[in-house]
Structure formats: C-alpha cells, structure tokens
A protein has these predicted regions:
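Hydrophobic alpha-helical connector segments
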Residues: 1-23, 78-81, 122
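Amphipathic alpha-helical segments used for helix-helix packing
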Residues: 18-40
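Structural helix-adjacent loops and short alpha-helical linkers that scaffold large soluble proteins
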Residues: 40-43, 71, 99-100
Length: 122
C-alpha cells in the first residue's frame, strides 16, 4: 500500500512538471463531468472504479489475513479508501498543491485500521 501511495504521488508530480498543474485522477475528472450527459462514459467510469476497488479489496483482504490491518469487510474498506484517495486528488487539483497528497498514507492506513510500516516502501 505504501508503494502504491508513492506511485500516486510520483505520477502526480511528473504530470505537474509537464503541465504546471496538479491533474488529479483523469477517470473521475472525466467521469464526474460527463456521467450525467453520456451513459457510455458513465458506465466505463463505473467499470474502472469497480476494477480498482476490486484490486484494493484484494490487497486489504491480504492485509487483514496477515494481521497488518484491522478486521472488517475488505470491500467496504476498499470503497472508503477509493473515496478518500479521489477526494484528496480532487483537493490537490483544486488547490494546485501536491503537498496535499502527503496525507495519502495517513488517511489510507487509518481507514483500513493499520499502522504505517517503518522504513522504505516495498
């Protein structure tokens, strides 16, 4: 999970260096704007979100199984994590401030009931 947080920050930083703007999540930006206007876009955005939540759910289930995350429903936790991350990316985009993404790990690990591991991300 820490490596994924690092990936998100690195990806946003690279885009910022190119466009001089925090870009946020392209799927939810486009999906959020067009979902009420275009059913195909809405359905595709839903599919992307569902795929990502499924990935997160599996990672969270593994963390629960190995005792590094608190017991609970991995699917629910994954949906909460997704909503948190999308919200943080949107906030960073609105404020054009990458520092907002420094809270990614703290919030994510709190939502799944886990401690942030010491040392570098794996």
């Amino acid at each position: 999970m820490r490596a994924w947080c690092d990936y998100v920050r690195k990806n946003q930083k690279q885009r910022f260096q190119t466009y001089r703007q925090v870009c946020g999540c392209p799927y939810t930006s486009v999906g959020g704007e067009l979902a009420t206007q275009d059913k195909k876009v809405r359905l595709e955005t839903q599919a992307l979100i569902d795929r990502f939540v499924k990935y997160l759910s599996g990672a969270i289930a593994d963390a629960i199984t190995d005792g590094s995350a608190a017991p609970g429903d991995p699917q629910t936790k994954a949906k909460l994590v997704h909503a948190f991350v999308v919200g943080l990316l949107l906030r960073a985009k609105i404020y054009n401030d990458l520092k907002i993404l420094s809270h990614l790990e703290t919030g994510l690990f709190a939502l799944i009931g886990a401690k942030i591991p010491k040392g570098p991300a794996k």
